[in-house]
Amino acid sequence: MVAIIKLKEHFSDEISDKTINEFKNLLSDKSYIENASLLFDTTKKIITFSRSSAVEDVIIYYKKYVDKVTCCHSLPLGEGKKFAEDLKKNMISSQLIEDGELSRFIPDSDFMLLGADAITEDLFMNKIGTLQAVLLAQHFKKPVYVISSPLKKIKKSDYSLEKLGQYFEAIDNSLITDFIY
């Protein structure tokens, strides 16, 4: 949905080679990988919730600094299971936990990494259950970082919170340690 909003925003005035190339650059922008380097000064234990291609890109790129990734199952759709399996295929130590076990594993982690389906000036949208995970991380004083392509940044006025659907929720940006683009 965000990609369609960005298309509309990007080409509202004109379609030219320049605007097409600018949009292609936006689609392929993975600057978040380099910008995440500040997180990996030493070996880390990471908690994730749901599945994000940006988070996966970062973990794979910095895998020599990753001790273990704990992936929440992220029910009801269970994206965390496939994420944990894919990390193992990339020779990254990972474990799958049930969402309700998160409070047992956060204390031993260094930080939580999340992706986002959309990011506005006040909120970000992600899989249902993300808010609970973020609040648990705060309780245990663990930083939470959202890794995202700049493509996911949109104006709040362009996003309909009513159309989030049953599998997504809005989380206040003030709960996040930092957004890495």
Regions found by a protein language model. Give the residues of each.
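N-terminal active-site beta-alpha-beta segment that forms phosphate/nucleotide-binding
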Residues: 2-97
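Conserved phosphate- and dinucleotide-binding cores of soluble alpha/beta proteins
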Residues: 73-181
